[in-house]
């Protein structure tokens, strides 16, 4: 049996063996975060993410979500691919300047992080049980009403940046978070000081100005929300601002000075899959549903489905068409779009029609 004072360092060691980069411990009193959460919901900043409102304050009350919870273990797992080069932020910005290249958010180019983290959090829980005996617990990673970023902040994983993501002096923000709710009391780890200062680069760079104030994001304007969570037509006013981003957006992270310290993952799971990096928009637009399912198997992109995939690419093709001054390129882009002009999906047809009109 491991005594409680020795347990957290032991957990940190076991976690490193499983590919986690940092472990923290938080208490369960998140009442100070409740007013901000309710105000954000009241302003409608969650958009169509109705599950955010449905669970209300339960998100800020771990012991209501999982009765008996008295401590929360937070876990950080870095996700930059193992082959990430020096100066990777500049490389990604350069790719954004190539209008016909499809841009998928870095985190989504590899294996679905839900599967990776959940399995390893459970292994960590099993390892703890071997040392202390059976205990009540439940593991989470972006999959339940959990205030992940707030728990991470309180447990010393980092501070909340003005883009609302958690920032670490040692790892920037290019990491996933996971939690273990447990019925065992552990000493909390200390929070860290914020280090954004007067910098607001993330606010300035956001293509759609979704960061409406420091620490305040209107999801309805966020490209990640629009390309992933939003099911219907993308607001026409926002389409030209999306550029060639077809799944997610990393701009607020790419510009952040702290991400020069972002760490490559120790796991192969997050290495980029060839079809999702450096591909041309027209190539991906040609995928039928069977090809889409095959190419996205085991990854996070599959969850949006083929229809939204085509919707997103149609917008990007329209932006590429508007940007080109080459008649040959314009003809090829129009030809690619024309293949879906009579698509079975009204959603796809509408976005294709918009895209074709960008070349007029």
UniProtKB/Swiss-Prot annotation:
InterPro entries on file: 4Fe4S_Fe-S-bd, 4Fe4S_Fe_S_CS, QueG, QueG_DUF1730
Positions with a binding annotation for [4Fe-4S] cluster 1 = 196, 199, 202, 256
Q: What class of enzyme is it?
A: oxidoreductase
Q: Where does [4Fe-4S] cluster 2 bind?
A: 206, 222, 249, 252
Does this UniProt record's set of keywords contain Chloroplast?
no
Write the Enzyme Commission number(s) for this entry: 1.17.99.6
GO CC, any one term: cytoplasm
Please list the reactions this protein catalyses.
epoxyqueuosine(34) in tRNA + AH2 = queuosine(34) in tRNA + A + H2O
For biological process, the GO terms are: queuosine biosynthetic process; tRNA modification
Q: In what residue span(s) does the 4Fe-4S ferredoxin-type domain sit?
A: 187-216
Localization (cell): Cytoplasm
Which GO molecular-function terms appear in the entry?
A: 4 iron, 4 sulfur cluster binding; epoxyqueuosine reductase activity; metal ion binding
For whether the record's keyword set contains Iron-sulfur, the answer is: yes
Which cofactors go with this protein? cob(II)alamin; [4Fe-4S] cluster
Q: Give the pathway.
A: tRNA modification; tRNA-queuosine biosynthesis
Swiss-Prot/TrEMBL keywords: 4Fe-4S, Cytoplasm, Iron, Iron-sulfur, Metal-binding, Oxidoreductase, Queuosine biosynthesis, tRNA processing
Question: Where does it mainly reside?
Answer: cytoplasm
The UniProt note on the cofactor reads as follows:
Binds 2 [4Fe-4S] clusters per monomer.
Disulfide cysteine pairs (residue numbers): none
Q: Subunit comment for this entry?
A: Monomer.
What family is reported? Answer: Belongs to the QueG family.
Q: Please identify the protein, giving its name as recorded.
A: Epoxyqueuosine reductase
């Amino acid at each position: 049996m491991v005594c409680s004072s020795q347990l957290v360092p032991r957990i940190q060691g076991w976690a490193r063996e499983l590919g986690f980069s940092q472990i923290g411990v938080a208490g369960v009193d998140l009442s100070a975060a409740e007013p901000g959460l309710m105000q954000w919901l009241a302003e409608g900043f969650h958009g169509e993410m109705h599950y955010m409102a449905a669970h209300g304050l339960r998100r800020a009350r771990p012991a209501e979500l999982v009765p008996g919870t008295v401590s929360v273990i937070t876990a950080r797992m870095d996700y930059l691919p193992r082959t990430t080069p020096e100066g990777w932020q500049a490389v990604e910005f350069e790719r954004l300047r190539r209008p016909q290249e499809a841009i998928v958010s870095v985190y989504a180019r590899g294996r679905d992080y839900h599967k990776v983290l959940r399995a390893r959090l459970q292994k960590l829980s099993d390892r703890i049980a071997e040392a202390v005996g059976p205990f009540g617990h439940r593991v989470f990673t972006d999959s339940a009403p959990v205030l992940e970023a707030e728990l991470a902040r309180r447990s010393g994983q980092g501070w909340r940046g003005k883009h609302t993501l958690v920032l670490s002096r040692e790892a920037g923000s290019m990491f996933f978070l996971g939690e273990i709710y447990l019925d065992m009391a552990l000493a909390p780890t200390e929070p860290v000081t914020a280090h954004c200062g007067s910098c607001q680069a993330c606010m300035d760079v956001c293509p759609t100005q979704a960061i409406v104030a420091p620490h305040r994001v209107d999801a309805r304007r966020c490209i990640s929300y629009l390309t992933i969570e939003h099911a219907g037509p993308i607001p026409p006013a926002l389409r030209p601002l999306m550029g060639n981003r077809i799944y997610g957006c990393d701009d607020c992270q790419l510009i952040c000075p702290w991400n020069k310290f972002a760490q490559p993952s120790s796991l192969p799971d997050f290495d980029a899959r060839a079809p999702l990096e450096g591909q041309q928009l027209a190539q991906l637009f040609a995928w039928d549903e069977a090809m889409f399912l095959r190419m996205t198997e085991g990854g996070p992109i599959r969850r949006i489905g083929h229809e939204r995939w085509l919707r997103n690419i149609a917008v990007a093709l329209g932006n590429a068409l508007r940007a080109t001054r080459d008649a040959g390129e314009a003809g090829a882009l129009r030809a690619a779009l024309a293949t879906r002009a009579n698509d079975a999906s009204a959603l796809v047809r509408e976005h294709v029609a918009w895209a074709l009109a960008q070349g007029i």
